[in-house]
């Protein structure tokens, strides 16, 4: 008998850290967690701090915190003033000079929340990649999650980067987002943009597909147990199918004359529709950042200007956009000292 005596190879700090990060625990950490957890914690903490205590008086001339009397729908972490351009507004930078109160007043929490939020979302996508690799499945969850990341980055970062300052990015709040949507409509005619149309089709189409799929599966469950309801009859480890694809195919073939017969194509289509829609809308927002025009039906505008009896829904919407610009510009750009007399404000032909 031969006995071999040797020393186990020494493990470096990287291997030790890798084992610790990937240890099986209730909440998986992983390498992605080094980015996800700190950034998500700081972004959420910055938003809660701003909405609770910090005013927007110095940046937008508004009250925006619970402390000032706002509610959940009207609080916001507001974007910095236009004068700061695209400065990252570091706490130690020349704007705040280490003064935390001043940093909050000038909008430092917005850049803090936006950047940590973006990296937190990217960390969550990397988390899905990492766990998919460890479990041994394909990474389509992470690929799908790239769509909301693209929308967030395009709206909160790319759009204001294309404009004159962070000021034109949306504030982090419900009413603040609504104001931003109205701004996009008034200054970019966003609802008539084909990329917006594709985004709406993707989101609503995805919701429709989700509802149809869920209802169809519920409709075709096998009666495979004596329990009080169909949910208790399911076992996570059962080998057989829990619903009938053949029956579902027959049903929709009768409804539309055509139906999915391949589960893999069906679920890929459910993935493709909303993800593509969100990506298209993100591309459209980047176009708005560059002030690209979409559809302008100039012939209708010229005819409406010449003929008092000719007006279309398009020309009325153009007038609404002019009204939005006239009312929002003095508020958003007070340093320009805009003054619009009543006679230049838009009025439809019918008025």
From Swiss-Prot:
Bilayer disposition of the protein: Multi-pass membrane protein
Cofactor binding, note field: The D1/D2 heterodimer binds P680, chlorophylls that are the primary electron donor of PSII, and subsequent electron acceptors. It shares a non-heme iron and each subunit binds pheophytin, quinone, additional chlorophylls, carotenoids and lipids. There is also a Cl(-1) ion associated with D1 and D2, which is required for oxygen evolution. The PSII complex binds additional chlorophylls, carotenoids and specific lipids.
Biological source species: Crocosphaera subtropica (strain ATCC 51142 / BH68)
GO biological process: photosynthetic electron transport in photosystem II
Keywords of the record: Chlorophyll, Chromophore, Electron transport, Iron, Magnesium, Membrane, Metal-binding, Oxidoreductase, Photosynthesis, Photosystem II, Thylakoid, Transmembrane, Transmembrane helix, Transport
Localisation: Cellular thylakoid membrane
Protein name, per record: Photosystem II D2 protein
Molecular function per GO: chlorophyll binding; electron transporter, transferring electrons within the cyclic electron transport pathway of photosynthesis activity; iron ion binding; oxygen evolving activity
């Amino acid at each position: 008998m031969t006995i071999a005596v040797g020393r186990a190879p020494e493990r470096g700090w990287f291997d030790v850290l890798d084992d610790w990060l990937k240890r099986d625990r209730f909440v998986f950490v992983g390498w992605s967690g080094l980015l996800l957890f700190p950034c998500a914690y700081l972004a959420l903490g910055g938003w809660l701090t701003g909405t609770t205590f910090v005013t927007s008086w110095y940046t937008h001339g508004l009250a925006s915190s619970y402390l000032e009397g706002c509610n959940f729908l009207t609080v916001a972490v507001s974007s910095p003033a236009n004068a700061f351009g695209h400065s990252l507004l570091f706490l130690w930078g020349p704007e705040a000079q280490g003064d935390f109160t001043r940093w909050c007043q000038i909008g430092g929490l917005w850049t803090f929340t936006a950047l940590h939020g973006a990296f937190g979302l990217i960390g969550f996508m990397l988390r899905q990649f990492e766990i998919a690799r460890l479990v041994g499945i394909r990474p389509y969850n992470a690929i799908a999650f790239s769509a909301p990341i693209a929308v967030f980055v395009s709206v909160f970062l790319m759009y204001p980067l294309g404009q004159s300052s962070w000021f034109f990015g949306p504030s982090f709040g419900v009413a603040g987002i609504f104001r931003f949507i109205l701004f996009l409509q008034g200054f970019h005619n966003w609802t008539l943009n084909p990329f917006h149309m594709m985004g709406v089709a993707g989101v609503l189409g995805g919701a429709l597909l989700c509802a149809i799929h869920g209802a169809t599966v519920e409709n075709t469950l096998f009666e495979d147990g004596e329990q009080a309801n169909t949910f208790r009859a399911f076992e996570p480890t059962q080998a057989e199918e829990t619903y009938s694809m053949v029956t579902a195919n027959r049903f929709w073939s009768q409804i539309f004359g055509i139906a999915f017969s391949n589960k893999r194509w069906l679920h890929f289509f459910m993935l493709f529709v909303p993800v593509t829609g969100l990506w298209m809308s993100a591309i459209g927002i980047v176009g708005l950042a560059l002030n690209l025009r979409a559809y302008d039906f100039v012939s209708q505008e010229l005819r409406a200007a010449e003929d008092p009896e000719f007006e279309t829904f398009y020309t009325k919407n153009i007038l609404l956009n002019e009204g939005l610009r006239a009312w929002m510009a003095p508020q958003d750009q007070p340093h320009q000292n805009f003054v619009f007399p009543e006679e230049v404000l838009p009025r439809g032909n019918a008025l």
